[in-house]
Regions:
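Calycin-type beta-barrel ligand-binding domains and close structural analogs
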Residues: 21-39, 46-59, 65-172
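C-terminal motif of bacterial Sec signal peptides marking the signal peptidase cleavage site
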Residues: 16-19
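Bacterial N-terminal signal peptides that target proteins for export
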Residues: 1-9
């Protein structure tokens, strides 16, 4: 997986990411979702460049709307909506759980909130300890990891090697 996944690719439409982590059913209950973005707001996306700096991403302005079920709707500039819920894990991070558009499965990313910035990590299955993943119940595919048999998803995500953030959102 390329470490240069854009904010738009990470959040918009379908969460179709090579090297992604997914499940056929949600691993985190909706009622345990937390309000990491408060009541929501307007956010500008930035992509991380090879030198570690961030560059404003084209077409990456999101309106984040809080839903009644504890999750959020990320609405892009084309009015496409990506529902997502956030769940706390160790280390002060949050797992974003989102249904993939057009598929009956869920994709996952990790967020770290720092003031008005949200750093987005897309854990790459290829860069994880394969023996440890199998021990935890992960089904390893060619470009993705299926976590339906993982008993403790919060501990699983907290144990992953996240690498560098691929992008960030900044509240406007």
């Amino acid at each position: 997986m390329s470490p240069r996944i854009s904010v738009f690719a990470a959040l918009a439409a379908s969460f179709l990411l090579s090297g992604c982590i997914f499940s056929e059913t949600p691993k985190f209950p909706a009622e345990n979702a937390v309000a990491v973005f408060g009541d929501g707001g307007r956010f500008q996306g930035y992509d991380r460049t090879e030198d570690g700096r961030y560059k404003k991403a084209d077409e990456a302005i999101f309106i984040v709307k809080r839903r009644g079920d504890g999750g959020y709707d990320f609405v892009d500039q084309k009015d496409e909506v990506q529902p997502i819920s956030f769940h706390p894990i160790a280390g002060g991070n949050f797992v974003g759980q989102a249904p993939e558009n057009g598929k009956s499965r869920y994709a996952y990313v990790v967020f770290r909130i720092a003031g008005n910035e949200a750093f987005i990590y897309v854990p790459d299955c290829d860069k994880q300890d394969k023996a440890q993943l199998k021990k935890l119940g992960v089904a390893i595919g060619q470009f993705e990891c299926k976590i339906d048999r993982v008993a403790d998803p919060a501990a699983f995500f907290a144990s992953l090697t996240l690498g560098e953030p691929t992008s960030k959102l900044v509240r406007e």
